[in-house]
Amino acid sequence: EITTRLVGSEMCIRDRYGFTTGSCAAAAAKAAAYMLLTGKIKNCITIETPKGIPYTAEVTDIVRGESQVSCAVVKDGGDDPDVTSGSKICATVTADNRGDGEKELLQIDGGKGVGRVTRPGLDQPVGNAAINHVPREMITREVQEVCRICDFHGTLHILISVPDGEALAERTFNPRLGIVGGISILGTTGIVEPMSSQALKETIRVELRQQRAEGQTIAAVSPGNYGLDFMQQTYGYDLDRSVKCSNFIGETIDMAAELGFCAMLLTGHIGKLIKVAGGIMNTHSHEGDCRMELLAAAGIRENVSLECLKKILDCVTTEEALAFIDAEGKKEDIMEDIMEKIDFYLKKRAAGRLQIECIVYSNTYGLLGMTAKAEELLRRLL
């Protein structure tokens, strides 16, 4: 799907969308459940993505048994292919008549080629298949729809697998994150939006210009969906008045200043914004990753024990590192140090052209820190 959006007098063109591994898993699971419960072949299937964009997928590799059906959907990365593009995302659905007779029971797990979580701090607990919560919700919703249509009230076991997942995982961050044996089934919106740097930056500029044209003088900016969700859920902020800047924090500051905003409020997860404390203004992992080193440096300044510092440096996620810091009773001290560094580098980039403030949060601990005048700026936004 190619999308075109008119903003003011400018046309913002995005290339062809792709669909996430989560969407593929949900489509394959829905198709397998449908074929199992109806006895009919299904060569294509449509699901609704969280983004609201329908996804119609071709169903391949169909194998039917008396109480089990498996099939596959080929991952289409659109115009932003990644290592999983072209891979088969498979689902095997097995029926079990046990249940309460009133409501179906769905059990979701990962099979061959789907990673298994071995370290804390990720979307799923240790021991679970690396099928993130949004794909699990998508699979559940789509299969429940089939159960309702077919008036099925038993148990369905849903196994997601990726035949080449183990090999693909070696080309991802999964081994370092402590996800072993395969890839992760991911996606928060269900779609893959084209990620060419120039296209993204043009989109950011157009959206900022639109906000400015509508009279906004303070730019509310977040690197991604999670930051925007935090703003909405914590402060009730209208997402339509927010701009997603991806990894381009420095350039977004420049754009906001050029377009005449008097201030900008940046809200994001510690895992992304910790990099700003080191003066990194493009937070993509390809540009550099010193998250644990920055946390450890703050720990040294705040007299954290050597044992804790070693644990921080061995962590793969900031959530995991925060748990060690919190256990030492140093979370507030370290976050105060980190926020001072973030404040310094943001103001250095802004160079007096606009006021800039920042809010940092964690999935586990919620609000972690604010720069000195962030709360005041937030009140003006609300």
For the regions a language model picked out, list residue spans one by one.
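Single conserved hydrophobic/aromatic residue that forms the stacking wall/gate
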Residues: 1-8, 13
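N-terminal loops that bind phosphate or other acidic moieties
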Residues: 16-53, 60-75, 79-85, 91-262, ...
